[in-house]
């Protein structure tokens, strides 16, 4: 009997691509064939084939920040992308499509509707993006990571890597720690400039009390090392973190942005967090962070309010007992079966 096939529509950022890979891998274990639809100039083009998943491409890009010519050309570009996606769907003959966000999802979702293929949509953020708001009107089923994106959609969490759920619980990790508090600063693949410029001034005042690791992002090691100056020996600086599970396990508290995937990873491992949301006009990252801050698992510091003095005052008053309680609260908010649940819904609607 022929294997069932899923077409994944996701691209642009790790927040869209990594959860989609987790779902794809879950279905691959159940003997599903997977095909991916993306764009050639975004991260999925290099990343997805590394997981042994074939990828095909359509031409589409975002409009934010583009000039008037691009806006005038947009209807033609979208129409062309829909036709490209429709042709690929007719060739691949998937039993279902999974939309996980990114520019590619819009035209590909419309094409799937035209081809009569079930559309399962997953919104990773606490507030839905424009593409998913529109696709939500034609999707067969809508799922969401947080309870605030769609009024009636099932909340399943964000699929995150299995190794994060396999870590020891916070009370076990914290049980034999008596040395300095450990602070992990995570800027993401591009780094977070505000963290890179603020933390060196914080370490100047707290190097004798706290231990720091700082992931600074692509190409930023030299600049940030200079900012740390004579305190550089007090900090472990890296461009990327290859083993996030080990880094989270090491930390007592994590300072980071609050992208959807990051928030769900923090919950999965059970870690105390200080979130500095990126300043989207739709407050997307702030609302993601509230999911944990509302239960006392995290502190939110708005970027406009972030100063070295403020961060120093907050950090120096933390105790390991406080942080353990925050970590335990974060763990209660995790949804370890997110990838499995999304896979179940796909199977349900593909029959």
Swiss-Prot record:
Recorded metabolic or biological pathway in which this protein acts: Cell wall biogenesis; peptidoglycan biosynthesis
GO CC entries: plasma membrane
Protein family per UniProt: Belongs to the glycosyltransferase 28 family. MurG subfamily.
Protein's cellular compartments: Cell inner membrane
Topological type in the membrane: Peripheral membrane protein
Amino-acid biosynthesis recorded as keyword: no
NCBIfam families to which the protein is assigned, alphabetical: murG
Binding site for UDP-N-acetyl-alpha-D-glucosamine: 13-15, 125, 161, 189, 241, 260-265, 285
Catalytic activity: di-trans,octa-cis-undecaprenyl diphospho-N-acetyl-alpha-D-muramoyl-L-alanyl-D-glutamyl-meso-2,6-diaminopimeloyl-D-alanyl-D-alanine + UDP-N-acetyl-alpha-D-glucosamine = di-trans,octa-cis-undecaprenyl diphospho-[N-acetyl-alpha-D-glucosaminyl-(1->4)]-N-acetyl-alpha-D-muramoyl-L-alanyl-D-glutamyl-meso-2,6-diaminopimeloyl-D-alanyl-D-alanine + UDP + H(+)
Biological function: Cell wall formation. Catalyzes the transfer of a GlcNAc subunit on undecaprenyl-pyrophosphoryl-MurNAc-pentapeptide (lipid intermediate I) to form undecaprenyl-pyrophosphoryl-MurNAc-(pentapeptide)GlcNAc (lipid intermediate II).
Keywords, in A-Z order: Cell cycle, Cell division, Cell inner membrane, Cell membrane, Cell shape, Cell wall biogenesis/degradation, Glycosyltransferase, Membrane, Peptidoglycan synthesis, Transferase
Documented EC number(s): 2.4.1.227
Gene3D superfamilies documented for this protein: Glycogen Phosphorylase B
A biological process term (GO) from this entry: regulation of cell shape
Protein name: UDP-N-acetylglucosamine--N-acetylmuramyl-(pentapeptide) pyrophosphoryl-undecaprenol N-acetylglucosamine transferase
Top-level EC class as recorded in UniProt: transferase
One MF annotation (Gene Ontology) recorded for this entry: UDP-N-acetyl-D-glucosamine:N-acetylmuramoyl-L-alanyl-D-glutamyl-meso-2,6-diaminopimelyl-D-alanyl-D-alanine-diphosphoundecaprenol 4-beta-N-acetylglucosaminlytransferase activity
UniProt-listed SUPFAM superfamilies: UDP-Glycosyltransferase/glycogen phosphorylase
């Amino acid at each position: 009997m022929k294997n069932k096939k899923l077409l994944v529509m996701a691209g642009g950022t790790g927040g869209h691509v990594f959860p989609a890979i987790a779902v794809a891998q879950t279905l691959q274990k159940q003997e599903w064939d997977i095909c991916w639809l993306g764009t050639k100039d975004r991260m999925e083009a290099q990343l997805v084939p590394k997981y042994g998943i074939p990828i095909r491409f359509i031409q589409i890009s975002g409009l934010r920040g583009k000039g008037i010519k691009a806006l005038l050309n947009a209807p033609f570009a979208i129409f062309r992308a829909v036709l490209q996606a429709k042709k690929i769907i007719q060739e691949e003959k998937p039993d279902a499509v999974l939309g996980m966000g990114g520019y590619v999802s819009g035209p590909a979702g419309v094409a799937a509707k035209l081809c009569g293929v079930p559309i399962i949509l997953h919104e990773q953020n606490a507030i839905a993006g424009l593409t998913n708001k529109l696709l939500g009107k034609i999707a067969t089923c809508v799922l969401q990571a947080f309870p605030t994106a769609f009024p009636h959609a099932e909340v399943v969490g964000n699929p995150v890597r299995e190794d994060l759920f396999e870590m020891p619980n916070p009370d076990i990790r914290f049980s034999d720690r008596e040395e300095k508090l450990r602070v992990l600063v995570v800027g993401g693949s591009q780094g977070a400039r505000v963290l890179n410029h603020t933390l060196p001034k914080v370490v100047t005042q707290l190097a004798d009390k706290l231990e720091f690791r700082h992931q600074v992002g692509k190409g930023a090691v030299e600049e940030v090392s200079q900012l740390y100056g004579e305190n550089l020996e007090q900090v472990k600086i890296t461009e990327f973190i290859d083993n996030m599970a080990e880094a989270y396990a090491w930390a007592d508290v994590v300072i980071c942005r609050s992208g959807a995937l990051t928030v769900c990873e923090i919950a999965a491992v059970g870690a105390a967090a200080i979130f500095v949301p990126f300043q989207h006009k739709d407050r997307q990252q702030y609302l993601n962070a509230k999911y944990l801050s509302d239960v006392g698992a995290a502190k939110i510091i708005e970027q406009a309010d972030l100063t070295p003095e403020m961060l120093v005052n907050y950090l120096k008053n933390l105790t390991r007992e406080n942080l353990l309680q925050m970590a335990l609260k974060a763990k209660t908010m995790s949804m370890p079966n997110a990838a499995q649940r999304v896979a179940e819904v796909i199977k349900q609607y593909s029959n």
